[in-house]
Amino acid sequence: MAASCVLLHTGQKMPLIGLGTWKSEPGQVKAAVKYALSVGYRHIDCAAIYGNEPEIGEALKEDVGPGKAVPREELFVTSKLWNTKHHPEDVEPALRKTLADLQLEYLDLYLMHWPYAFERGDNPFPKNADGTICYDSTHYKETWKALEALVAKGLVQALGLSNFNSRQIDDILSVASVRPAVLQVECHPYLAQNELIAHCQARGLEVTAYSPLGSSDRAWRDPDEPVLLEEPVVLALAEKYGRSPAQILLRWQVQRKVICIPKSITPSRILQNIKVFDFTFSPEEMKQLNALNKNWRYIVPMLTVDGKRVPRDAGHPLYPFNDPY
């Protein structure tokens, strides 16, 4: 069953459910991608920093293309430019590395992963002596211009942003000749992102939700944090509709026309996550789920400095999460 799609301003159809691959280990991700394709997924979300693009590429080579299970034009593949590759000279080589790893001739969507740049080079997390990150002064507007050249060369069909706030999106729009088509951010009922979604939709951007299930498998999880999949409203709806809590969270998003990229390597869950197009919540039920919002952000990159866990980039002038949205 092919997932329903949203139409990007480029004319591309982007499936509302994709397979997320963050934290999918090499050794497991190839089988997950092959299984997802076999049950109807047509959207795979990747990133250079996830360290598993070569293995995803093996799956794509086996199953995608002329005479194979999935025609290339039916598949939507996203990847992301890492923070160490923001310098305009580094953008095309970074993309070409991703294309080589994924064994593709073009990407459907290429995102700037974060608004700020790290020091150039091959160390993905360059550090100062005190353990803090070494940043680079390249501004995202310069990076954007280099990304636009990739579209002109036919290497990328659409561009987008990840982890940008509303002000930064408008900043990009002020210089863009190729307008961003998608914003990818953390989003789930605890972090509903209503203002940011409205901001994007008013400007012709679609929104992709990462960690749509609340990302309880993160290494730095706080034992006291709320668990979205155990929320009583979610459990009650799961019982009513005979669905899993995960399916309830995903249905809420697709009913708002928000794209979701739940990560799984478990076949039963991969299958479950795409089966969210055959039931519909009432307006009242949508309201109940909307009411869970507490602006709770699970994904804040952390560092240990002097034995304490601190937000890694919060002091950077381009850090996106200091603004209201």
UniProtKB/Swiss-Prot annotation:
Keywords: Acetylation, Cell membrane, Cytoplasm, Lipid metabolism, Membrane, NADP, Oxidoreductase, Phosphoprotein. NADP(+) binds at residues 11-22, 45, 162-163, 211, 213, 215-216, 263-266, 269, 272-273. Widely expressed. Highly expressed in kidney, salivary gland and liver. Detected in trachea, stomach, brain, lung, prostate, placenta, mammary gland, small intestine and lung. InterPro entries: AKR, AKR1A, Aldo/ket_reductase_CS, NADP_OxRdtase_dom, NADP_OxRdtase_dom_sf. Its EC number is 1.1.1.2, 1.1.1.372, 1.1.1.54, 1.1.1.19. Changing E55D: Reduced activity towards daunorubicin. Pfam families: Aldo_ket_red (PF00248). The modification N6-succinyllysine is found at K127, K145. The active site is at Y50. GO terms for biological process: aldehyde catabolic process; cellular detoxification of aldehyde; D-glucuronate catabolic process to D-xylulose 5-phosphate; daunorubicin metabolic process; doxorubicin metabolic process; glutathione derivative biosynthetic process; lipid metabolic process; negative regulation of apoptotic process. The record marks K80 as: Lowers pKa of active site Tyr. The modification N6-acetyllysine is found at K127. Changing I299C: No change in enzymatic activity. GO terms for molecular function: aldo-keto reductase (NADPH) activity; aldose reductase (NADPH) activity; allyl-alcohol dehydrogenase activity; glucuronolactone reductase activity; glycerol dehydrogenase (NADP+) activity; L-glucuronate reductase activity; methylglyoxal reductase (NADPH) (acetol producing) activity; S-nitrosoglutathione reductase (NADH) activity. Changing K127A: Abolished S-nitroso-CoA reductase activity without affecting ability to reduce S-nitrosoglutathione, glyceraldehyde or glucuronate. It catalyses: a primary alcohol + NADP(+) = an aldehyde + NADPH + H(+); allyl alcohol + NADP(+) = acrolein + NADPH + H(+); glycerol + NADP(+) = D-glyceraldehyde + NADPH + H(+); glycerol + NADP(+) = L-glyceraldehyde + NADPH + H(+). This is Aldo-keto reductase family 1 member A1. It comes from Homo sapiens (Human).
